[in-house]
Swiss-Prot record:
Subunit structure: Forms a co-chaperone complex with MCM2 and histone H3.3-H4 heterodimers. Within the complex, interacts (via C-terminus) with MCM2 (via N-terminus); the interaction is histone-dependent. Within the complex, interacts (via C-terminus) with histone H3.3-H4 heterodimers; the interaction is direct. Interacts with histones H4, H3.3, H3.2 and H3.1, but not with CENPA or the testis-specific histone H3.1t. Interacts (via J domain) with HSPA1A, HSPA1B and HSPA8. May interact with TONSL; the interaction seems to be histone-dependent.
Keywords: Cell membrane, Chaperone, Cytoplasm, Membrane, Nucleus, Phosphoprotein
Entry function: Acts as a dual histone chaperone and heat shock co-chaperone. As a histone chaperone, forms a co-chaperone complex with MCM2 and histone H3-H4 heterodimers; and may thereby assist MCM2 in histone H3-H4 heterodimer recognition and facilitate the assembly of histones into nucleosomes. May also act as a histone co-chaperone together with TONSL. May recruit histone chaperones ASF1A, NASP and SPT2 to histone H3-H4 heterodimers. Also plays a role as co-chaperone of the HSP70 family of molecular chaperone proteins, such as HSPA1A, HSPA1B and HSPA8.
One Gene Ontology cellular component annotation held by this UniProt entry: nucleus
PTM sites of type Phosphoserine: 109, 215
Alphabetical list of Pfam families matching this protein: DnaJ (PF00226), HTH_DNAJC9 (PF23302)
Originating gene: DNAJC9
Region spans: Required for histone binding: 171-249
Protein's UniProt name: DnaJ homolog subfamily C member 9
Chain intervals with Basic and acidic residues compositional bias: 193-208
Protein backbone atom coordinates (compact mmCIF):
# COMPACT_ATOMS: atom_id res chain seq x y z
CA UNK A 1 0.00 0.00 0.00
CA UNK A 2 1.35 3.41 -1.00
CA UNK A 3 1.86 6.35 1.33
CA UNK A 4 -1.25 8.23 0.20
CA UNK A 5 -3.42 5.15 0.74
CA UNK A 6 -1.87 4.61 4.16
CA UNK A 7 -2.64 8.21 5.10
CA UNK A 8 -6.23 7.80 3.97
CA UNK A 9 -6.57 4.65 6.03
CA UNK A 10 -4.86 5.89 9.19
CA UNK A 11 -5.49 9.65 9.24
CA UNK A 12 -8.70 9.85 7.21
CA UNK A 13 -7.18 11.89 4.38
CA UNK A 14 -4.76 11.34 1.51
CA UNK A 15 -3.75 15.01 1.58
CA UNK A 16 -0.27 15.15 3.12
CA UNK A 17 -0.77 18.76 4.18
CA UNK A 18 -3.98 17.90 6.00
CA UNK A 19 -2.20 15.07 7.80
CA UNK A 20 0.20 17.64 9.27
CA UNK A 21 -2.53 20.23 9.78
CA UNK A 22 -0.85 22.89 7.64
CA UNK A 23 -1.79 24.85 4.53
CA UNK A 24 -0.42 23.91 1.12
CA UNK A 25 1.60 27.14 1.02
CA UNK A 26 3.19 26.43 4.41
CA UNK A 27 6.83 27.37 4.89
CA UNK A 28 9.43 24.74 5.78
CA UNK A 29 9.21 25.90 9.38
CA UNK A 30 5.42 25.55 9.45
CA UNK A 31 5.66 22.04 7.98
CA UNK A 32 8.19 21.11 10.65
CA UNK A 33 6.02 22.51 13.44
CA UNK A 34 2.98 20.74 12.03
CA UNK A 35 4.88 17.46 12.01
CA UNK A 36 6.00 18.05 15.57
CA UNK A 37 2.52 18.84 16.85
CA UNK A 38 0.87 15.80 15.25
CA UNK A 39 3.75 13.50 16.16
CA UNK A 40 3.32 14.39 19.83
CA UNK A 41 -0.22 13.05 19.62
CA UNK A 42 0.78 9.71 18.09
CA UNK A 43 4.23 9.11 19.60
CA UNK A 44 4.50 5.44 20.72
CA UNK A 45 5.87 6.44 24.12
CA UNK A 46 2.64 8.25 24.95
CA UNK A 47 0.34 5.20 24.81
CA UNK A 48 -0.13 2.00 26.74
CA UNK A 49 1.26 -1.34 25.64
CA UNK A 50 -2.04 -2.35 24.07
CA UNK A 51 -2.00 0.65 21.71
CA UNK A 52 1.73 0.78 21.05
CA UNK A 53 1.67 -1.19 17.79
CA UNK A 54 -0.99 1.06 16.25
CA UNK A 55 0.76 4.21 17.51
CA UNK A 56 4.08 3.02 16.08
CA UNK A 57 2.47 2.50 12.68
CA UNK A 58 0.94 5.98 12.75
CA UNK A 59 4.25 7.48 13.87
CA UNK A 60 6.14 5.80 11.03
CA UNK A 61 3.63 6.94 8.41
CA UNK A 62 3.76 10.45 9.80
CA UNK A 63 7.55 10.43 9.54
CA UNK A 64 7.29 9.50 5.87
CA UNK A 65 4.82 12.31 5.27
CA UNK A 66 7.26 14.78 6.77
CA UNK A 67 10.13 13.29 4.76
CA UNK A 68 8.24 13.99 1.54
CA UNK A 69 7.17 17.53 2.43
CA UNK A 70 10.56 18.48 3.85
CA UNK A 71 12.36 17.35 0.69
CA UNK A 72 12.22 20.14 -1.90
CA UNK A 73 12.12 17.88 -4.95
CA UNK A 74 9.61 15.42 -3.50
CA UNK A 75 7.35 18.22 -2.35
CA UNK A 76 7.45 19.85 -5.78
CA UNK A 77 6.41 16.59 -7.43
CA UNK A 78 3.59 16.13 -4.94
CA UNK A 79 2.38 19.72 -5.37
CA UNK A 80 2.41 19.50 -9.17
CA UNK A 81 1.13 15.96 -9.70
CA UNK A 82 -0.54 14.97 -6.44
CA UNK A 83 1.56 11.81 -6.37
CA UNK A 84 4.45 10.46 -4.31
CA UNK A 85 7.51 8.69 -5.70
CA UNK A 86 7.31 5.48 -3.68
CA UNK A 87 10.72 4.35 -4.98
CA UNK A 88 12.58 7.46 -3.85
CA UNK A 89 15.27 7.07 -1.16
CA UNK A 90 13.18 9.37 1.04
CA UNK A 91 10.60 6.59 1.41
CA UNK A 92 12.57 3.41 0.81
CA UNK A 93 15.42 3.93 3.27
CA UNK A 94 15.24 1.94 6.49
CA UNK A 95 15.07 4.73 9.05
CA UNK A 96 14.66 4.65 12.82
CA UNK A 97 11.86 7.21 12.98
CA UNK A 98 12.05 7.69 16.75
CA UNK A 99 15.78 8.41 16.60
CA UNK A 100 15.13 10.77 13.67
CA UNK A 101 12.47 12.58 15.71
CA UNK A 102 14.82 13.01 18.65
CA UNK A 103 17.43 14.56 16.37
CA UNK A 104 14.93 17.07 15.04
CA UNK A 105 13.47 18.21 18.34
CA UNK A 106 15.56 19.07 21.37
CA UNK A 107 14.31 18.62 24.92
CA UNK A 108 13.52 21.53 27.19
CA UNK A 109 13.63 21.81 30.97
CA UNK A 110 10.90 21.82 33.58
CA UNK A 111 11.73 25.43 34.33
CA UNK A 112 11.08 26.22 30.67
CA UNK A 113 7.69 24.55 30.87
CA UNK A 114 6.68 26.41 34.00
CA UNK A 115 7.82 29.74 32.57
CA UNK A 116 5.96 29.09 29.34
CA UNK A 117 2.75 28.07 31.08
CA UNK A 118 2.84 31.16 33.27
CA UNK A 119 3.04 33.52 30.30
CA UNK A 120 0.85 31.46 27.94
CA UNK A 121 -2.30 31.12 30.02
CA UNK A 122 -4.55 34.11 29.55
CA UNK A 123 -2.42 35.48 26.72
CA UNK A 124 -3.54 36.56 23.26
CA UNK A 125 -1.70 33.53 21.90
CA UNK A 126 -3.74 31.15 24.04
CA UNK A 127 -6.94 32.93 23.03
CA UNK A 128 -6.06 32.56 19.35
CA UNK A 129 -5.12 28.90 19.82
CA UNK A 130 -8.42 28.11 21.56
CA UNK A 131 -10.42 29.73 18.77
CA UNK A 132 -8.32 27.94 16.15
CA UNK A 133 -8.88 24.59 17.88
CA UNK A 134 -12.61 25.32 17.96
CA UNK A 135 -12.54 25.88 14.20
CA UNK A 136 -10.26 22.93 13.49
CA UNK A 137 -12.50 20.48 15.33
CA UNK A 138 -15.84 22.15 14.54
CA UNK A 139 -16.72 22.64 18.20
CA UNK A 140 -15.84 19.14 19.44
CA UNK A 141 -14.80 19.79 23.05
CA UNK A 142 -13.16 16.37 23.41
CA UNK A 143 -10.61 17.28 20.76
CA UNK A 144 -10.37 20.93 21.79
CA UNK A 145 -9.46 20.02 25.37
CA UNK A 146 -6.83 17.57 24.12
CA UNK A 147 -5.22 19.97 21.66
CA UNK A 148 -4.95 23.22 23.63
CA UNK A 149 -1.71 23.45 25.58
CA UNK A 150 -1.47 23.57 29.38
CA UNK A 151 -5.17 22.87 29.92
CA UNK A 152 -6.50 20.74 32.78
CA UNK A 153 -10.01 19.29 32.78
CA UNK A 154 -10.94 21.62 35.65
CA UNK A 155 -10.42 24.53 33.25
CA UNK A 156 -13.16 23.47 30.86
CA UNK A 157 -15.58 26.18 32.09
CA UNK A 158 -12.92 28.80 31.32
CA UNK A 159 -12.31 27.38 27.85
CA UNK A 160 -16.04 27.16 27.11
CA UNK A 161 -16.51 30.75 28.23
CA UNK A 162 -13.75 31.96 25.89
CA UNK A 163 -15.34 30.12 22.97
CA UNK A 164 -18.84 31.36 23.81
CA UNK A 165 -17.62 34.94 23.93
CA UNK A 166 -16.01 34.46 20.51
CA UNK A 167 -19.31 33.07 19.17
CA UNK A 168 -21.29 35.98 20.64
CA UNK A 169 -18.83 38.43 19.09
CA UNK A 170 -19.21 36.81 15.67
CA UNK A 171 -15.54 35.82 15.58
CA UNK A 172 -16.31 32.11 15.08
CA UNK A 173 -19.41 30.25 13.88
CA UNK A 174 -21.79 28.45 16.21
CA UNK A 175 -21.25 24.69 15.84
CA UNK A 176 -23.92 22.32 17.13
CA UNK A 177 -21.21 20.04 18.51
CA UNK A 178 -20.43 22.84 20.96
CA UNK A 179 -23.70 24.64 21.69
CA UNK A 180 -25.77 21.44 21.80
CA UNK A 181 -23.27 19.08 23.40
CA UNK A 182 -25.04 16.49 25.56
CA UNK A 183 -24.49 16.23 29.30
CA UNK A 184 -23.67 12.55 28.76
CA UNK A 185 -20.70 13.46 26.57
CA UNK A 186 -19.56 16.15 29.01
CA UNK A 187 -19.70 13.72 31.92
CA UNK A 188 -17.83 11.04 29.97
CA UNK A 189 -15.05 13.52 29.21
CA UNK A 190 -14.88 14.53 32.87
CA UNK A 191 -14.65 10.89 33.98
CA UNK A 192 -11.83 10.18 31.54
CA UNK A 193 -9.92 13.23 32.71
CA UNK A 194 -10.37 12.30 36.36
CA UNK A 195 -9.10 8.78 35.69
CA UNK A 196 -6.05 10.16 33.88
CA UNK A 197 -5.40 12.54 36.77
CA UNK A 198 -5.52 9.64 39.23
CA UNK A 199 -3.08 7.63 37.11
CA UNK A 200 -0.72 10.60 36.94
CA UNK A 201 -0.88 11.04 40.70
CA UNK A 202 -0.16 7.34 41.24
CA UNK A 203 2.84 7.56 38.92
CA UNK A 204 4.11 10.61 40.80
CA UNK A 205 3.86 8.75 44.10
CA UNK A 206 5.57 5.67 42.65
CA UNK A 207 8.47 7.89 41.63
CA UNK A 208 8.60 9.37 45.11
CA UNK A 209 8.25 12.93 43.85
CA UNK A 210 7.21 16.00 45.79
CA UNK A 211 6.16 19.27 44.20
CA UNK A 212 9.65 20.78 43.94
CA UNK A 213 11.30 21.12 40.57
CA UNK A 214 14.74 20.18 41.89
CA UNK A 215 13.54 16.99 43.53
CA UNK A 216 11.53 16.12 40.43
CA UNK A 217 14.55 16.48 38.19
CA UNK A 218 16.76 14.55 40.59
CA UNK A 219 14.28 11.70 40.84
CA UNK A 220 13.82 11.47 37.09
CA UNK A 221 17.55 11.33 36.54
CA UNK A 222 17.91 8.46 38.99
CA UNK A 223 15.10 6.30 37.57
CA UNK A 224 15.10 3.66 34.90
CA UNK A 225 15.18 4.52 31.22
CA UNK A 226 11.50 3.86 30.61
CA UNK A 227 10.49 6.30 33.30
CA UNK A 228 12.82 8.91 31.88
CA UNK A 229 11.04 8.48 28.57
CA UNK A 230 7.73 9.27 30.22
CA UNK A 231 9.06 12.59 31.48
CA UNK A 232 10.68 13.31 28.12
CA UNK A 233 7.25 12.98 26.53
CA UNK A 234 5.76 15.38 29.06
CA UNK A 235 8.47 17.90 28.26
CA UNK A 236 8.07 17.34 24.53
CA UNK A 237 4.41 18.38 24.62
CA UNK A 238 5.55 21.95 25.10
CA UNK A 239 8.35 22.08 22.51
CA UNK A 240 6.23 23.01 19.50
CA UNK A 241 5.02 26.18 21.19
CA UNK A 242 8.03 27.07 23.29
CA UNK A 243 10.58 26.69 20.53
CA UNK A 244 8.47 28.34 17.83
CA UNK A 245 10.20 31.22 16.08
CA UNK A 246 8.59 34.62 16.32
CA UNK A 247 9.41 35.17 12.66
CA UNK A 248 7.57 33.98 9.58
CA UNK A 249 4.39 32.18 8.87
CA UNK A 250 2.08 32.89 11.79
CA UNK A 251 -0.83 30.60 12.63
CA UNK A 252 -1.46 27.40 10.77
CA UNK A 253 -4.68 27.16 8.82
CA UNK A 254 -7.33 24.74 9.95
CA UNK A 255 -7.26 21.75 7.62
CA UNK A 256 -8.53 18.94 9.82
CA UNK A 257 -12.10 19.47 8.73
CA UNK A 258 -13.04 16.30 6.94
CA UNK A 259 -14.56 14.52 9.93
CA UNK A 260 -17.64 16.10 11.48
Amino acid sequence: MGLLDLCEEVFGTADLYRVLGVRREASDGEVRRGYHKVSLQVHPDRVGEGDKEDATRRFQILGKVYSVLSDREQRAVYDEQGTVDEDSPVLTQDRDWEAYWRLLFKKISLEDIQAFEKTYKGSEEELADIKQAYLDFKGDMDQIMESVLCVQYTEEPRIRNIIQQAIDAGEVPSYNAFVKESKQKMNARKRRAQEEAKEAEMSRKELGLDEGVDSLKAAIQSRQKDRQKEMDNFLAQMEAKYCKSSKGGGKKSALKKEKK
